[in-house]
Amino acid sequence: MTYELKGGAFPVVVCQLADGEKMVTEKGSMVWMSPNMEMSTSGGGLGKMFSKAFSGESMFQNIYTAHGAGMIAFGSSFPGRILPLTIQPGQEVILQKAAFLAAETGVNLSVHFNKKMGTGFFGGEGFIMQRLSGSGVAFAEVDGELVEYTLGPGQQMVVDTGNVLGFEGGVSIDIQQVKGLKNKLLGGEGFFNTVLTGPGKIWLQTMPISGVASALIPYIPTCGNN
């Protein structure tokens, strides 16, 4: 499989497949394809279906198979970027649960539960995430622009939870309480931040869709407004 990223701030990834090659996606993100691509739907087994239902994900995956040389394009659902990730055997990448776009079928997608329960209960989106393992190329949706850092052993980055796109498996995630009652009540940044600790790469996004939705709420007409 070869691929090309197109579209700027409204991106698509166009994948060229050889005969018999397959791509998988969870969210119906296919935007166009050649007529010799065949789609099938799989639940991935009862255990995987249960874990996906628990995490709020779709319980089914769409698998696209090329019969002869074929082409298929996957589009992002929000303005931003598409991040290609090459997954090597023994390597893991953890993503926010809505970030996965598509992958080669050699990439295994599973639910990742953070070991520290407070990360999810107090940190918001970070408790249930997605784990990519196996071997192959995967693509992740980025809300807004992408910023990448490589953390050394013990090096930390404090991030608003919604701005965390993902990180390598060697990076640990925790929460940090914002200090000071005045900061909590008047700072407008919430009560908790996410702390990522190296070693490994982390990927951050500049405009999480949750933040955009919150910013638009005051401008949405209600029954009491003219």
PLM regions: where:
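Composition-driven recognition of glycine/serine/threonine/acidic- and proline-rich low-complexity segments
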Residues: 1-226
